[in-house]
A protein has these predicted regions:
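Short, solvent-exposed loop/turn and secondary-structure capping segments
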Residues: 117-121, 138, 176-180, 206-207
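Mid-length scaffold segments of soluble, non-membrane domains
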Residues: 95-162
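Catalytic cysteine-centered active loop of the rhodanese-like fold, especially the PTP/DSP P-loop
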Residues: 146-201
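Solvent-exposed loop/turn segments at secondary-structure junctions
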Residues: 111-115, 130-133, 170-174, 199-203
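Bacterial N-terminal signal peptides
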Residues: 6-18
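Active-site neighborhoods of enzymes that stabilize oxyanions during catalysis
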Residues: 206-216
């Protein structure tokens, strides 16, 4: 059975072939049944397609293979027990199933200077340090925004919490794993958290597009 994502991609590709929409991804598709993918988040429509230049390479800081460890050490595949690790296709499916329907958020957990330099289209900036429950004045408002409700006993009720897919710079970056661990420490359901371990480095390595937030 085709997933909702595959069905959407098939429909979009059919529109492009019929002339009802712009032709996309002539040579480099995302997947065999996915030449490109479009989604609308908070009123903005994004087209995700890979760089069509088969000679393209990564440039800039994400082209580096080695960083001092610690602190930039390779992270395990699993950020925490019960948290599913995903790749690029699962990220797009998450956007289709949860972000477009307002049931979830694609969270860029990096500090704002990284976010401002370029992020995955449709993501929101919620830096990892916002999820530190100790001495952070923004902690309660942020968790409330995610659907958490603070109970009279000081614990959180996450029955209506959003599904979150968190990412940072790559397998060597600790920002999204730290955010995930802090969320779990206050009772956020692990089954509502996903971890895109590849992060920005893998996203760029696949030739996928980034955007700079408006006003930057």
């Amino acid at each position: 059975m085709l997933s909702r994502l595959s069905i959407l991609c098939t429909l979009l590709f059919g529109l492009a072939l019929s002339g009802a929409g712009p032709a996309k991804a002539e040579n480099v598709w995302i997947a065999p049944d996915m030449p490109f993918f479009e989604y609308t988040v908070r009123g903005q429509t994004y087209t995700i397609e890979r760089n069509q230049d088969t000679n393209a390479t990564i440039t800039g800081s994400f082209a580096k293979t080695s960083r001092k460890c610690p602190p930039f050490c390779i992270h395990p595949m699993k950020a925490a027990d019960g948290v599913v690790t995903v790749g690029e296709l699962e990220l797009l499916e998450f956007v289709a199933d949860y972000v477009e329907t307002d049931l979830g958020l694609l969270v860029d957990a990096r500090l704002s200077n990284w976010y401002d330099a370029g992020t995955i289209p449709g993501s929101v900036s919620l830096p990892f340090n916002l999820f530190d429950p100790t001495g952070n004045p923004f902690f309660k408002p942020v968790v409330s925004r995610l659907g958490g409700q603070l109970k009279a006993d000081g614990n959180w009720d996450f029955a209506d919490a959003k599904h979150l897919l968190l990412f940072c710079n790559g397998p060597w970056c600790d920002q999204s794993p730290r955010a995930i661990r802090n969320l779990i420490s206050i009772g956020y359901p692990a089954e509502k958290l996903l971890y895109y371990r590849g992060g920005m480095q893998s996203w760029l390595m696949m030739g996928l597009p980034t955007i700079k937030p408006s006003g930057v």
